[in-house]
Structures are given as C-alpha cells and as structure tokens.
Amino acid sequence: SFLPEEDQGVFLTMIQLPAGATQERTQKVLDQVTDYYLKNEKANVESVFTVNGFSFSGQAQNAGMAFVSLKPWEERSGDENSAEAVIHRAKMELGKIRDGFVIPFNMPAIVELGTATGFDFELIDQAGLGHDALTQARNQLLGMAAQHPASLVSVRPNGLEDTAQFKLEVDQEKAQALGVSLSDINQTISTALGGTYVNDFIDRGRVKKVYVQADAKFRMLPEDVDKLYVRSANGEMVPFSAFTTSHWVYGSPRLERYNGLPSMEIQGEAAPGTSSGDAMALMENLASKLPAGIGYDWTGMSYQERLSGNQAPALVAISFVVVFLCLAALYESWSIPVSVMLVVPLGIVGVLLAATLFNQKNDVYFMVGLLTTIGLSAKNAILIVEFAKDLMEKEGKGVVEATLMAVRMRLRPILMTSLAFILGVLPLAISNGAGSGAQNAVGIGVMGGMVSATLLAIFFVPVFFVVIRRCFKG
C-alpha cells in the first residue's frame, strides 16, 4: 500500500439504494445504520451524523452518508476497539441489510489523495463505444471481481446508477417561427423549476436575498412544463406545448470523465492477508479480459502507489551507490566500501522479518525505515573496519589480528550507539492512537533492522573484511 491505515477517530459509511428509491426509504436504512452503531458498538462509538441525499457517489434520493465519530483513543484500548476492527464488524453486520448497499470504510491518511482507503480504479471508454457498452463492461468487471473473495473485498462502483429521466426536446424551427429565442426558453425553465436569484433587499436591518421560482404545486408533474409560457419577440406569450415534446428516458444522472474520456470509477479493497499491490495486479488482469476499446487507469492513492512502487528499486539502488561512493572517497579505497556494504543486507533482513512478524505493509514509511537501516548498518561496520585499517597501517599488524583487536575494542561503542538508537525508535514501534500507523511502520522496521544489523555485524563484519582485503591484495 502507499500509506498505512490510520485510526483517526472517525470513519464513514456510504449507503446506496436501488435507482429510483425515495428519500424516505433511504432514511429508513440510515436509521438502521445509526441504531447498529449506537447499540452494537456503543463501547466505541461516540456519535453518528447522517446525511440523506448525498454521498461520494453523487447527490440523489437513493444515496446517503453516515459520519461515525469514535470515542477518544484512551477509552478504546486494544486492537478489537480500533477503527479498523469496528469497520470490519460493521461490514459483516450491515452487509445483511437487503434494501441497499451499506459500505463502511476508513478515511485515507491524506484526505487530498482520495475519499476512502483501498484502490481507485477508472474504467475508460477509449473507443467511443457508448454509455451502455461502458456500463456492461463495468458490470462484467464487478462480476469477475466478485469471484475472487480471497483477494478482493468491497469492490463497488463509485457513482450513481442509471435512473429514469424526463427529457424535454425543443423544436428549434417551430420556436424560431414563433419568435421565441433559445436563451429565453432556457431561462424560463431554469427559473420555474430551479429558481433564479434576483437581488437583495433590506428587511428590518438585515439583507435578504430574493429568488424567483414556481410554486411547488405547479412544478410537481411532467405536464406542468407544458403550462409554462415564454414571451416571444413580438410580446405574445407562447406556451411550451407549442414547440416542445417530452418523454421519459433511462440514463446516467451525471457525466463522468477521466482525461476527457467517458469513465466509471470503481473502488475496492484488498482482502485481509492480500497486499494492495496484489489486489491491483488482479484488477488489471481482470480488466484486460474486457472487450476491446475499454481501458483503465489508476487514480488517487492508487496512482501514487503505482508511481512509488516503480521507483522503489531505483531508490534503493541509488542509496547503495551513494553510500558506496562516499565511503570510497572517505577512505580512498575500494576494498573498505565493499566490506562495509556487504553488511547492509543483514540489516535489510531484520527489517523484512520485523515487518512480516508485526503484519506491516510495504508502504512509503516502510521505505523510509529501509533506507534509514542501510545507513545505520553501514555505521556499525565502519566502526570495526576503520579501526582495523588504522591498526594495519600504523602498527603493521596482520589483517586477522587487526580485525580481532578492532572487534574487541569497538564492541562497546557499537552496542551503545545501536542500543541508543533502538530505544529511540521504541516509542514509534509501540505507539497507538492518532498517527500510530505511520509511526509503527517506521519504528518497527528500523528497530528490526538495527537489532539484526547489530547482532550479526559483530560476527560477519570481521569475516567480510578479512576476505575482501585478501581478495583485493591478491
């Protein structure tokens, strides 16, 4: 993953009912969600704030959101009371609601990179196949994703489903013959049905806004549109029925574009035990089976994760090269940097073992800890190698004798500096509450790397130094 999940003390729940569902029906589902959190999770949930008619998928009567505020972290000690655990239980229970989709999800660690944790997948109509073909491809992809519950969970479209729409068609030739302009037609429709701001007026010392709109009872039915009138160029009032026809159609309530092309967003998460990289690779594999002309791309945190994942090998390689060149310039030797850099993998092994044991993910903070361990591992080796080099050059001792003396004399400084650093990152490794995800990712990785680099370096650095010196001497 790009960033670890954080317990921010609040998470979201999105409610999506079938297209055409009324606001009252949506409210009943919101009430069920609220009752669940306040009764079943009363030990962890402080309050629930619901919004009817709005969600991240769009504004509609069949959409809703619930903002769940958790109690302070000191009152929710233990992994079973974390936001992640509460969300997991909510998915199991709220998934039983048959009247619509109820999807609890955590907020991203960086809000600017998306609206939810997991991946953001854009399905794109690259060949102009049309809305129906894109919808069919989306449903096909969702069906294939549902067949992999061990790798993918909560795979869902992030948008509003097609619904009934009232389409008003204007016969421009008739309107022109009657002396009615299109701008007047649009203005009349906008004012009567949506309302138009006119001006302000002062009422008892307060500024109030004036809006013009048809009364509710005159804009409730499709037939009410035919009763609207627009003024023609010669001043006559012309009814809409004279130049318009209307009928019901079925279509998308909003236009979605990605890089200028028709698209549909799909969100989802990796199943427990599956890395986000594997989940994203599986989605790409499934998308490759869709009809020709349907493409895909990543957005939000998934896009950043793809970029950072591709850069990680180069970043580690550059770190190795920079450390090696600095050591070569410092000691004016090629053998010493080689013997020092051979110790770095020992620290990396510790980082990987610690991350595996404590179920840490390969995120950007893990990479920070990994790069830090490279430098710290080299530091321990330098303490031994530099002293052995001085004994060989200034006192004329043999490579084995100088190395053994260096190990004995530098053991205490190695242990002291390493122990100081391990204790320094210990608060990061054991932290909980706000920001603990990022702190754990750095602290656990660096701590594991320092433990392995310290314990193994004492035994392996002398061996590496002796072997490399003899090889270069030979």
Task: Show which residues each predicted segment covers.
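Signature of alpha-helical transmembrane segments and their immediate interfacial
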Residues: 1-2, 408
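Structured binding elements
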Residues: 345, 438, 442-443
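Hydrophobic transmembrane alpha-helices and their membrane-interface caps
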Residues: 325-410, 415-434, 448-452, 456-459, ...
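Membrane-helix entry/capping segments
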Residues: 293-315, 358, 364, 436
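Interfacial helix-loop-helix hairpins and adjacent transmembrane helices
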Residues: 19-25, 29, 46, 404, ...
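Surface-exposed amphipathic alpha-helical segments in non-transmembrane regions
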Residues: 12, 25-50, 60-164, 173-299, ...
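Loop-to-transmembrane-helix entry motif
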Residues: 301-319, 406-417, 445, 449
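Alpha-helical transmembrane signal-anchor/signal-peptide segments
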Residues: 2-13
